[in-house]
Each structure stands twice: as structure tokens, then as C-alpha cells.
């Protein structure tokens, strides 16, 4: 088996080695899993619900929500509404507790008769420490059928970028890949 490599000159071995390293590096950059239906009716009412931020990066949820709203509208989801928290009771817990804010948003979406809600969580949204400082993003998305509370589609993914890329740019690429099979008809 290794006798084949004896016939390759040193330049060829270096090229072969570099190709193998590049292939391994590129294949390790993105990990994605998806589950559920992928075609949704454009006539149904949609709401973008708050995300849970587990990343430790302040306001990462707001950034993801804005990028996601733009990508969904580009896919043809023209009737997408964005949930905005109304602090009528001057209660700070929903602002500080992502899970509680998400639960209250889902309840409000049900009362407002939305059919689908899209939400999720941010697991990672930062730059890796070290010389390169590459961006690293980890996201979970869920589409919830609001009247039933059933999760009808979900996706999770992680992506790392190169040193010159931004976290938002890497996040946008990951969101685009997560939504690649979703069709709005």
C-alpha cells in the first residue's frame, strides 16, 4: 500500500499532504443536523420569537434575530412579524431570563393567533482565543406550530470561520445553511 508513495517525488508528496490537510480542515468547519418538514405555506402567519442566549456574549440573540428575519424575508416570508416585549408590569425577570421571555412570547403569539413561530438558542457566538482569533458560532433553530405547541422543524449547527471573518458573517452563513432546505410556498 505504501509502495505507491515511494514513486511520488517530494513535491508530489507535499501536494498530497497539503490536499489532505485542506480537506480535513474544510470538513471540520461546519456541523449541521436537521429534522422535520421543510415546506411551509406563505399564507400562514409567522412570528419571530426571542432566542435564548447561552453564549455569554451580550445581545447575541438580538443579532441572530435580525439576521434571521432578513434571511426569512429573502426566502419569501413576507408576512413575518417580530415579537417585541411589552413591559407593562415593569417586571425585570422576562428581560433577564431568556426562557421566561421566550415562554411569554409564545403565549402572546398564541393569543395573537400566529400559526408558526420560529425561535431557538445561541450556544456560541464569539471569537476563539489564540493567535488566529477565528469566529465560532453554534445555533439551534425551531419552528413551532403555535396552536398545538408542536415543534415541526428543527435544526442545529456549528460553524467556525477564518481569522479575517466576523462572528456576524459566520453566523449569517450558518443560518443560511440551516435554512437551505426550507421552502416557503
Residue ranges and their predicted role:
Residues 42-43, 50, 55-112, 150, ...:
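N-terminal segment of the mature soluble domain
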Residues 1-29:
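Sec-dependent bacterial lipoprotein signal peptides
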Residues 110-120:
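Mid-length scaffold segments of soluble, non-membrane domains
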Residues 55-56, 126-128:
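Short, solvent-exposed loop/turn segments at secondary-structure junctions
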Residues 121-125:
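Generic short beta-strand segments
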